[in-house]
Amino acid sequence: MFSRMCLRFPWLSPPFISPSTSRPEVLRSLLTGHKFRQLFSSRRRIKFSQGSIKFLQTLCRISVPGVPVRETQPPSKFLKDKKVVPQADPPSAEDVNHLYQLIDQSTKLVVLTGAGISTECGIPDYRSPNGAYSSGFKPITHQEFVRSSRARRRYWARSYAGWRRFTAAQPGAAHVALASLEQAGRINFMITQNVDRLHHRAGSNPLELHGTVYSVICLDCGFSFCRNLFQDEVKALNPKWAAAIESLDYGNAGSDKSFGMKQRPDGDIEIDEKFWEEDFHIPTCHKCNGVLKPDVVFFGDNVPKERADKAKEVARECDAFLVLGSSVMTMSAFQLVSFRILM
């Protein structure tokens, strides 16, 4: 079976994957469900996967010459208890074969990833049955953030509280598999809707369509700086708040519930108003004293033109477009897929 799989998947032959891993496992780590829809235009192919990635008990072990092997770890017990991974049937052999054919026959493959690719890492998505929207959560909009100091205070208080847990997430099997395929030359370009930087930590360098929570930007002068520095400034301005948050036992779900906490896809945490409403202070811009926000595209905002143009360019030039972990419900992603279909 091992030699047969090597012949069938020549681009996954050693040294790209160790003999301890079967070839179907590699492709299964990329699948986000058991149902595929394939759309054909006159010149292009687009393949969707529905559902969400399920964590593999037997992890893919992929290596590329000159690239260190990164160990992937299962989600923590706490994150498993939160049930952020939607239920999905395992991919069939037919599913794996469909994905193999798409990758094998393409020379300019573009991959678009969404929140579903990070659920097994402990970061929930929005639209699955267990996603953020299922509990009535409504993410902050750009308009709310800009016009309301109260909304900004609520956002930053929750985001500060959720930062330690959010940044503790590790890349999953799919992140690692995509990074290895990218470095092996099988993926021409990667675009992600996610703001969690898990692709980067796995070794990829995708275009971050919606930005990243790892940077903070001034709405007035455009100055940007590292989020960790912002966290330190919040701590200095709110020592009692910071001490209360840091004293929580993150391995004990009960202690989180005492603060009314629940992790969200964009890195913040749902938390009772009484814990942030009074006396929470937000840092201002170092250069102009302006309003700071995470360098992400909130709902109601537009993707920066340069970024959007780059995404459209690679979509226009690709010969195959693979969507993983996304329902393509946001306009920025929908436009890319629609753009491919109409060509």
Language-model features: locations:
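Conserved catalytic core of sirtuin-type NAD+-dependent deacylases
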Residues: 2-343
